[in-house]
Amino acid sequence: MEHCTFNLPDVQASKPSIAINLTRVGVTNVKKLVEIKRKDKRPIVLISTFDVFVDLPSDRKGANLSRNFEAVDEVLEKILSMPVYEIEQLCSDIAHNLLGRHEYANQAEVRMTSEYMIRRASPATGIKCQEVVNIFAEASAVRGQGNDDYFDVKKLIGAEVVGMTACPCAQEIMRDKAANELSELGVDKDTIIKFLERVPMATHNQRGRGIISIKVAHDFDVSLESIISIIDHSMSSSVYEVLKRADEKVVVETAHMNPKFVEDCVRTMADNVVKEFPNLPDNAVITIKQTNEESIHRHNAYAERVALMGDLRSEINHC
């Protein structure tokens, strides 16, 4: 009996009924185990989530999504044979690989999120604990006009860190009340001033969430550890998973001796980004966000700054 053979049509390559181009087509929530090597330290193993996209021209019905998985897997396999030190470079390599596989696409994007464990000690007793920091990276590759073999690659690295803030406004109200009460009790003015300088007044607190992301060209590297440190030190105090009573005293006192509005946190981060990264190019894109979860209000407080590094550097240097 003679068997008939059929050539299966490439449905994705057929023309769509509505011929418009699409900005992003791809896959989201792809889970992968990623090992990042470190100099003179043990590697970091991350359980990471990837979103992978390419653009789609108007004359094509669909994208070959299996190629997205192949691109991610191929680049991750290379980690076994060569050291990878930055998650943003990993995203950059995947984006570059995507454009090579999707010949019809002009742009590829990769996003990666993960939880990064850091070890730290409590401020007074030195109890060791592990803290979780949310980290993320992105990369985009754009095919060069007139040269399909040239890809313009940009990459982004960032982190979100949780801390604590103390409200300056409410603290001034309580400071004024304390001064009046002490005066009525017969305490002289100089003693009141000395007391208020040594003992911080009560105020309401917020759990703050600071975010910094830095976008650069493919040939620049940005320290993730520096980003995390900048965010952590921009708020009134760090927070810790485990605290003894002596530690609680230090955290509360530190926060109330360093009260900050949500705007102060963003400005502090901006100032420290300029100081910490003097070699960043002027066209690097800096995004800084701070959300303070209010304790006495139903709303949250928010502030943000997006700027080119050159503009930020110029503003701060002229303050």
Swiss-Prot record:
Protein name per UniProt: GTP cyclohydrolase MptA
Catalytic activity of the protein: GTP + H2O = 7,8-dihydroneopterin 2',3'-cyclic phosphate + formate + diphosphate + H(+)
Name of one Pfam family that matches: GCHY-1
Keywords in alphabetical order: Hydrolase, Iron, Metal-binding
Names of required cofactors: Fe(2+)
Source organism of this protein record: Methanosarcina barkeri (strain Fusaro / DSM 804)
Subunit structure: Homodimer.
Cofactor binding note: Binds 1 Fe(2+) ion per subunit.
GO molecular function, one term: GTP cyclohydrolase I activity
Enzymatic class: hydrolase
Record function comment: Converts GTP to 7,8-dihydro-D-neopterin 2',3'-cyclic phosphate, the first intermediate in the biosynthesis of coenzyme methanopterin.
GO biological process: tetrahydromethanopterin biosynthetic process
EC number(s) given by UniProt: 3.5.4.39
Marked site positions, May be catalytically important: 167
Coiled-coil stretches: none
The family this protein is said to belong to: Belongs to the GTP cyclohydrolase IV family.
Pathway as given in its UniProt record: Cofactor biosynthesis; 5,6,7,8-tetrahydromethanopterin biosynthesis
